[in-house]
Amino acid sequence: MSDYIKSIEYTTKLTSGSHWSLRVRRGTFMRLTDLTGDANVGMLFYNPEDLLERYNAPDTLKCQHTFKLTKGNCLYSDMGRIFASIVEDDLGWHDTVAGNSRAEHIEAQWGKRDYQADRNAWKQNGHDSFLVELGKYGLNAADLAANVNLFSKIEISNEGDMALAENHSKPGNSVLLRFEMDTLVLLHTCPHPLDKSAHYPRGKVKIELGVAQPIAEDDYCKNFRPENGRGFENNALYHIGL
């Protein structure tokens, strides 16, 4: 078991084209494992006590001087607080710049979706998946933000064009998030918007939830960047009296 995990309390598996949401408490971990290879997990984060506070991709990248997400990086809100830290990572690169797939992306690449014909194997897109989950909390399209795409790597050509790296995630690769404040998590397993596979992906992702070990003073994420130390200070101030 990981040094960051105290106990595993819940496990589930999601196939491609699925979506899910839940409130995750501070001190909880979420480990996501790509069971089949080349998974994509789109994620958004909100403060359940103030839904106006949400994940901010530009600030997350800017304050940590990076274009990618990996071990040591923290996922910031637009209030300068840390939703979660990436405490373990098998891949070394996760995307948070390319955005989300939409119905037109899916149709152009793999044809129209048809629930009547395909049933639960229909070709769902990330945008509509997020809208379904947002609606459960009184939110809508206006509340969407730039999302994380776990397990996906972006390559940039000399001309500045973005492309999805092929065969980036292998079966069994995982990433471990430790939540530093109560967080409303929205996620989907729909294809990355730059996915050019011949067929709609049919992979599977395992998600484990449980109690994380307490944060030590020499915590890797806390000390990864000076900015992260200040982010943890913002969280400490926010949690006074709780």
Regions found by a protein language model. Name each.
Residues 1-242:
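Acidic, Ser/Thr/Pro
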